[in-house]
Amino acid sequence: MGYNKSLRYSRHEGTTCVIDNHHLKSLGSVLHDVRRKKDRIREAEYEPIIDLADQYMVTEDPFRGPGKNVRITLFKEIRRVQPDTMKLVCNWSGKEFLRETWTRFISEEFPITTDQEIMDLWFELQLRPMHPNRCYKFTMQYALCTHPDYIAHDVIRQQDPYFVGPNNIERINLTKKGFAFPLTCLQSVYNDNFEGFFEDVLWPYFHRPLVYVGTTSGEIEEIMIEVSLLFKIKEFAPDVPLFTGPAY
């Protein structure tokens, strides 16, 4: 096909097609303009919904709120769980707890060294199967507002339990409403009298949890239980610097 003079002109009479760099645009900028236009359309659709939603308040996860999380791992232990039953995790009776087959105590020292304000206390439970290729889920039941003189059973039957959260980790908030935890030096109390630390220091201001765990398996399973307490400490800046130097 040779040169055709008529190709220089458009199909419209009296006009010509002029192509120069002033009328060219990169494809990326075109796509960017399309995306921005879609975002503006989407924002215009959500504006009345957002105005209505601003009139309501929703609760957030208090574990992810302000403050610093300090963990104290009490023990790791292997338990044998029978089918259709649930075992008590911890009876809070001092350093023995409920030792069965193998127990390892982790924290010998209390992690909070100074007088700090305790905002929240969490009971964290991590469960792991001890044998590979086991297809079952972990179940759990717990009670908070039990009578102080109530003696919990070591084994109960499963009745309407719920499944443990993602990654086989479950956290329970132990904070009592209307109770403020005093500023005390917890490290000395923890190190001097571990057995009386829970009864004298924690349980007057926080709930004493009775936690039972089980499995959906039809066989006897060995599970690893790791029990921790998470203290949420209020972080605040001192009025005057206590130290001077580049490290502070």
Curated annotation (Swiss-Prot):
Keyword Transmembrane helix present in the record's keywords: the answer is no
Annotated InterPro entries: Polyhedrin (IPR001746)
Q: Does the keyword Transferase apply?
A: no
Give UniProt keywords alphabetically: Viral occlusion body
What is a single molecular function from GO for this protein? structural molecule activity
Taken from the record, one Pfam family name reads Polyhedrin
Gene Ontology cellular component annotations, sorted alphabetically: viral occlusion body
Q: Which family does it belong to?
A: Belongs to the polyhedrin family.
Its biological purpose is as follows:
Component of the virus occlusion bodies, which are large proteinaceous structures, that protect the virus from the outside environment for extended periods until they are ingested by insect larvae.
Write the protein's name. Answer: Granulin
